[in-house]
């Protein structure tokens, strides 16, 4: 069995449901410290939701101008398993069947972490004095609130003036085969909770009440039909979607006094959070609604245009697999949104994502070593460029 698979299984066997780390970071620090990494814990959060964070950095070969830094970012936490009896094998017992490795976190994203650790081990064995600095940013709070994880580490790094140049996030980005898709950006996410106030009353006497659902519907229809922007070469147009509508007392003869609507923007770089907020408020005001609206900005959009990192990863994928990879900004958010604040080039690359968060999550074993090799080839290419500069 390959060293990558062995490490992946060791990580999968640790039941690290958010915010638990279950010893994953201790295991990983034990692999990184002998390679010359300085491992620093940056745990955060209240005792009731304590998050484990690791920042591990290895300096470049000494002398000269400040070295550029490549960071691998990942999360050791996983989502809940769902009913264990529905799994074909225990979710935290790594199992091999039909050429696949099964277990919670196999694809999201413990195999990616294992692959990058082994890639770094192989790279440093061949290049013990690299021209670039290497770092790992790992957290146990990506699948949850994402408040005390990567966000906190990035803030601490920024406060002490540490600079990052390239970042690879090990999210499962591939579709059918490892390397067929990478993410070079993500849309922003902006959520709103709208409460429209009316007057509660008997359903037989509407003249004595004011139905907030009826009042809200025209405004909601207009919001749903609005073209917020047209997207661009890298992003689809900004979308607005309702996720929940709550109104009524449960009785069938009462006009409700309020209706609550939860909605979300996934917005591209053609729009801003403040601009979207202003447009929504103007629309609601125009409809004459009596309302309250609270906003939650989950993350700004980010984009890494084709450059050093994208080119290095694309070439590594082609050299290893023969695939011409597709650049994409689709899908949900990731911790890349926090890292992009302090790192100009961020991409995401990992195994196929067809089974993430599902019963019987797995990776195809034949995809594992190519992923490790792609990471190693990327390291080699970026290091060669830095050495030649």
Curated annotation (Swiss-Prot):
Please tell me where Zn(2+) 1 binds in this chain: 75, 108, 171
GO MF entries: acetylornithine deacetylase activity; cobalt ion binding; succinyl-diaminopimelate desuccinylase activity; zinc ion binding
Q: Name one Pfam family in it.
A: M20_dimer
Q: Which residues bind Zn(2+) 2?
A: 108, 143, 357
Q: Which cofactor does it need?
A: Zn(2+); Co(2+)
**Pathway field:** Amino-acid biosynthesis; L-lysine biosynthesis via DAP pathway; LL-2,6-diaminopimelate from (S)-tetrahydrodipicolinate (succinylase route): step 3/3
Q: Which GO terms describe its biological process?
A: diaminopimelate biosynthetic process; L-arginine biosynthetic process; lysine biosynthetic process via diaminopimelate
Its domain of life? Bacteria
Show the catalytic activity.
N-succinyl-(2S,6S)-2,6-diaminopimelate + H2O = (2S,6S)-2,6-diaminopimelate + succinate
What does the record's cofactor remark say about binding? Binds 2 Zn(2+) or Co(2+) ions per subunit.
InterPro entries cross-referenced by the UniProt entry: Bact_exopeptidase_dim_dom (IPR036264), DapE_proteobac (IPR005941), Peptidase_M20 (IPR002933), Peptidase_M20_dimer (IPR011650), Peptidase_M20A (IPR050072)
Keywords of this entry? Amino-acid biosynthesis, Cobalt, Diaminopimelate biosynthesis, Hydrolase, Lysine biosynthesis, Metal-binding, Zinc
Q: What Enzyme Commission number does this protein have?
A: 3.5.1.18
Question: Which sites are catalytic?
Answer: 77, 142
Q: What is this protein's function per UniProt?
A: Catalyzes the hydrolysis of N-succinyl-L,L-diaminopimelic acid (SDAP), forming succinate and LL-2,6-diaminopimelate (DAP), an intermediate involved in the bacterial biosynthesis of lysine and meso-diaminopimelic acid, an essential component of bacterial cell walls.
| Membership in a protein family | Belongs to the peptidase M20A family. DapE subfamily.
Q: Relate the assembly described in the record.
A: Homodimer.
This protein is called what? Succinyl-diaminopimelate desuccinylase
């Amino acid at each position: 069995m390959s060293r990558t698979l062995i490490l992946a299984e060791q990580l999968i066997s640790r039941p690290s449901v958010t915010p638990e780390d279950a010893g994953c970071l201790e295991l990983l620090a034990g692999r990184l410290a002998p390679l010359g990494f300085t491992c620093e814990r940056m745990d955060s959060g209240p005792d009731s939701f304590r998050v484990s964070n690791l920042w591990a950095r290895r300096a470049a070969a000494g002398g000269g101008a400040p070295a550029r830094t490549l960071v691998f970012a990942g999360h050791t936490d996983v989502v809940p398993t769902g009913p264990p009896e529905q799994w074909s094998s225990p979710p935290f017992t790594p199992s091999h069947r039909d050429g696949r490795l099964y277990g919670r976190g196999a694809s999201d994203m413990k195999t990616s972490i294992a692959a990058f650790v082994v890639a770094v081990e192989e790279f440093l064995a061949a290049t013990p004095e690299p021209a670039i600095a290497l770092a790992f940013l790992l957290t146990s709070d990506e699948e949850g609130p994402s408040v005390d994880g990567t966000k906190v580490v990035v803030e601490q790094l920024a406060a002490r003036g540490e600079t990052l140049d390239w970042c690879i996030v090990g999210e499962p980005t591939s579709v059918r085969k490892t390397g067929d898709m990478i993410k070079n950006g993500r849309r922003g996410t902006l959520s709103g909770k709208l409460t429209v106030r009316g007057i509660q009353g008997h359903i037989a006497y509407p003249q004595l009440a004011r139905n907030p659902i009826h009042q809200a519907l025209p405004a909601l229809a207009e919001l749903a039909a609005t073209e917020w922007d047209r997207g661009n070469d890298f992003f689809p147009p900004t979308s607005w979607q309702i996720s929940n509508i709550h109104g009524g007392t449960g009785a069938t003869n009462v006009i409700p006094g309020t209706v609550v609507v939860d909605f979300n923007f996934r917005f591209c770089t053609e729009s801003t959070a403040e601009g979207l907020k202003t447009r929504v408020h103007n629309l609601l005001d125009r409809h004459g609604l009596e309302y309250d609206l609270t906003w939650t900005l989950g993350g700004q959009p980010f984009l890494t245009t084709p450059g050093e990192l994208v080119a290095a990863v694309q070439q590594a994928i082609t050299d290893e697999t023969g695939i011409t990879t597709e650049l994409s900004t689709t899908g949900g958010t990731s911790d890349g949104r926090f890292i992009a604040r302090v790192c100009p080039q961020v991409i995401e690359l990992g195994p196929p994502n067809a089974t993430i968060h599902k019963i019987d999550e797995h990776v195809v074993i034949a995809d594992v070593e190519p992923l490790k090799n792609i990471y190693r080839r990327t390291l080699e290419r970026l290091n060669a460029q830095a050495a030649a500069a």
